[in-house]
């Protein structure tokens, strides 16, 4: 295959890559009201690149989300909840209850980590 054939092949692969990428949107469980057993799957708009599941007391939120907003401050502000556990992910239908129980991030875990880290650093620096 000469240079011209290689260019044609490269062009075809590039076109296929663009069409394959643009045709898929992330699927998430998304329920308008908090519910413990959300089974409604939606194709998220291109504005959203992550799925979110959040538990705040008895409320469970399943939503399409922006990955850049997958942090405690943004989640609590946008959902208007003060104490919660959340889990963000970037695969289709990954925001289900078991994920939250296995890998969620809660305020208490972060607080403990923030309190323990300086003490460990101080102890390490005092060690002869």
UniProtKB/Swiss-Prot annotation:
InterPro entries: CD59, CD59_antigen_CS, LY6_UPA_recep-like, Snake_toxin-like_sf
Disulfides per UniProt: 28-51, 31-38, 44-64, 70-88, 89-94
Record PTM text: N- and O-glycosylated. The N-glycosylation mainly consists of a family of biantennary complex-type structures with and without lactosamine extensions and outer arm fucose residues. Also significant amounts of triantennary complexes (22%). Variable sialylation also present in the Asn-43 oligosaccharide. The predominant O-glycans are mono-sialylated forms of the disaccharide, Gal-beta-1,3GalNAc, and their sites of attachment are probably on Thr-76 and Thr-77.
UniProt effect for mutating residue 67 to K: No loss of function
UniProt keyword terms in alphabetical order: Cell membrane, Disease variant, Disulfide bond, Glycation, Glycoprotein, GPI-anchor, Hereditary hemolytic anemia, Lipoprotein, Membrane, Secreted, Signal
Primary localization: membrane
Matching SMART domains: LU
Annotated consequence of substituting residue 65 to E: Complete loss of function. Lysis
Outcome of mutating residue 48 to R: Some loss of function. Some lysis
Gene Ontology, cellular component aspect: cell surface; endoplasmic reticulum membrane; endoplasmic reticulum-Golgi intermediate compartment membrane; ER to Golgi transport vesicle membrane; external side of plasma membrane; extracellular exosome; extracellular space; focal adhesion
Lipidation (GPI-anchor amidated asparagine): 102
Carbohydrate attachment residues: 43, 66, 76-77
Signal peptide: 1-25
A GO term, aspect molecular function: complement binding
The UniProt record lists the keyword Signal: yes
Impact noted for substituting residue 69 to Q: Loss of glycation mediated inactivation
Location in the cell: Cell membrane; Secreted
Domain UPAR/Ly6 positions: 26-108
Membrane topology: Lipid-anchor; GPI-anchor
Gene Ontology biological process terms in this record: blood coagulation; cell surface receptor signaling pathway; negative regulation of activation of membrane attack complex; regulation of complement activation; regulation of complement-dependent cytotoxicity
Positions of the propeptide segment: 103-128
PROSITE patterns named in the record: LY6_UPAR (PS00983)
Cited function: Potent inhibitor of the complement membrane attack complex (MAC) action, which protects human cells from damage during complement activation. Acts by binding to the beta-haipins of C8 (C8A and C8B) components of the assembling MAC, forming an intermolecular beta-sheet that prevents incorporation of the multiple copies of C9 required for complete formation of the osmolytic pore.
Disease in which the protein is involved: Hemolytic anemia, CD59-mediated, with or without polyneuropathy: An autosomal recessive disorder characterized by infantile onset of chronic hemolysis and a relapsing-remitting polyneuropathy, often exacerbated by infection, and manifested as hypotonia, limb muscle weakness, and hyporeflexia.
Summary of subunit composition and partner proteins: Interacts with T-cell surface antigen CD2.
Protein name: CD59 glycoprotein
Biological classification of the source: Eukaryota, Metazoa, Chordata, Craniata, Vertebrata
């Amino acid at each position: 295959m000469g240079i011209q054939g290689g260019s044609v092949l490269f062009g075809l692969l590039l076109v296929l890559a663009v069409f394959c990428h643009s045709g898929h949107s992330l699927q998430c469980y998304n329920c308008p009201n908090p519910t413990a057993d959300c089974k409604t799957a939606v194709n998220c708009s291109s504005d959203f690149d992550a799925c979110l599941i959040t538990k705040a007391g008895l409320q469970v939120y399943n939503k399409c989300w922006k990955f850049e907003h997958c942090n405690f401050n943004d989640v609590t502000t946008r959902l208007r909840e003060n104490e919660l556990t959340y889990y963000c992910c970037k695969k289709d239908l990954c925001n289900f209850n078991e994920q939250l129980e296995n890998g969620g991030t809660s305020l208490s875990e972060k607080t403990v980590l923030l309190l323990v880290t300086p003490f460990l650093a101080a102890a390490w620096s005092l060690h002869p």
